[in-house]
């Protein structure tokens, strides 16, 4: 009997050992972001997690290698930085290698030792630097020449050609106000209400996008739509943002940096060659919403086939602040769709949809009707005495 118990114990011990999950290094991040582009920090912080399910598991050492060539990193070589082995449990480490250059992709990995001092290497990750200084901008700040009281949102466009094969392309856009960026009719990125709020007369944020796949051989077009955001409050409310010292008509600056397969680089900047016009958004306020007149839509306005002969020239604007830097945080995004949980008809013109919870978001509706019909959407957190929003 004792022999059978011993065999049974040995059997389960073997199962336990063989079933151990191998040590893995995961969630590699640069400045807390997953493979970011457009970093401005000259000493970005690199972080990771060790997955080790064993009791008493601990990291006993780390070593980081950084190089411009991913193959070198795979082979454990870091010409930009080889930290050497550090007997430490740290999993957040500031870069301490050679000076990083703007517009450059750097690959990196980490090699860690576990509690048994066995080494495990992570997959290769990367980060990509951005402007790293205002002196590298080529674009000028431009606007539509209107004042702070003008209601319609400004649309901007620029056509250009690519005569060679494109290796990569990055769009860098800074705005005072809000923006949406389009290339060849496609909205770029999944950002909402970008860039994020700052004290606009002291600091402005730019966002970098990989737009390689959006470019096409030959004719191309860029489109930018600006909104007032927190920069130009046309609605009076709490906190007196309508009297903010930075208040002005929205403006932006953009560099589209194209790298060709032959190694040459071309930049399409904002300048006086851009064109501007108004469109379907006749009013926008971060407090009181948006007025959209579908009769004023300019279909295809961000495509190269669009006729912009009725559009007008842009105007130069002064830089809102002397500090234009990368937005190195997670953006606002649409992350979940909430369908209405109930519906109630109040009268022939009023309907109430209840989504079952409080949230921040936008409403998506599909409507049809006679041209010029006005549809109003009002959001609220509670109903009044008449059970109306």
Regions found by a protein language model. Name each.
Residues 1-24:
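Bacterial Sec-dependent N-terminal signal peptides
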Residues 21-389:
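Extracellular/oxidizing-compartment recognition motifs
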């Amino acid at each position: 009997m004792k022999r059978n118990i011993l065999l049974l114990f040995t059997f389960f011990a073997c199962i336990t050992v063989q079933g151990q999950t191998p040590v893995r290094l995961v969630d590699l991040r640069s400045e807390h972001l997953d493979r970011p582009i457009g970093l401005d920090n000259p000493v970005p912080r690199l972080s990771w997690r060790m997955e080790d399910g064993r009791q008493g598991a601990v990291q006993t050492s780390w070593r980081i290698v950084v190089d411009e060539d991913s193959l070198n990193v795979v082979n454990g070589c870091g010409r930009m930085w080889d930290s050497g082995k550090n007997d430490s449990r740290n999993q957040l480490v500031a870069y301490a290698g050679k000076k990083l250059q703007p517009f450059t992709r750097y690959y990196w990995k980490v090699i860690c030792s576990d509690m048994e001092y066995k080494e495990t290497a992570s997959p290769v990750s990367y980060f990509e630097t951005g402007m790293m200084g205002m002196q590298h901008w080529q674009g000028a700040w431009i606007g539509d020449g209107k004042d702070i009281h003008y209601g319609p949102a400004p649309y901007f466009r620029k056509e250009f050609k690519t005569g060679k094969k494109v290796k990569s392309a990055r769009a860098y856009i800074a705005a005072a106000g809000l923006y949406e960026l389009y290339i060849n009719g496609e909205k770029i990125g999944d950002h909402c209400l970008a860039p994020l709020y700052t004290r606009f007369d002291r600091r402005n944020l730019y966002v970098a996008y990989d737009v390689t796949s959006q470019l096409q051989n030959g004719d191309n077009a860029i489109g930018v739509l600006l909104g007032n955001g927190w920069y130009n409050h046309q609605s009076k409310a709490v906190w007196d943002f309508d009297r903010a010292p930075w208040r002005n008509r929205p403006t932006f600056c953009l560099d589209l940096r194209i790298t060709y397969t032959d190694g040459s680089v071309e930049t399409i900047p904002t300048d006086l060659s851009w064109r501007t016009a108004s469109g379907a958004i006749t009013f926008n306020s971060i407090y009181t919403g948006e007025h959209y007149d579908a009769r004023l839509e300019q279909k295809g306005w961000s495509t190269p086939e669009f006729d912009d002969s009725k559009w007008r020239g842009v105007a130069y604007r002064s830089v809102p602040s002397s500090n234009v830097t990368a937005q190195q945080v997670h953006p606002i995004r649409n992350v979940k769709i909430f369908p209405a949980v109930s519906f109630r008809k109040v009268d022939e013109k009023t309907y109430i949809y209840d989504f079952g919870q409080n949230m921040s978001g936008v409403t998506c509706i599909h409507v049809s009707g006679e041209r010029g019909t006005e549809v109003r959407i009002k959001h609220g957190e509670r109903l009044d005495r008449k059970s109306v929003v």
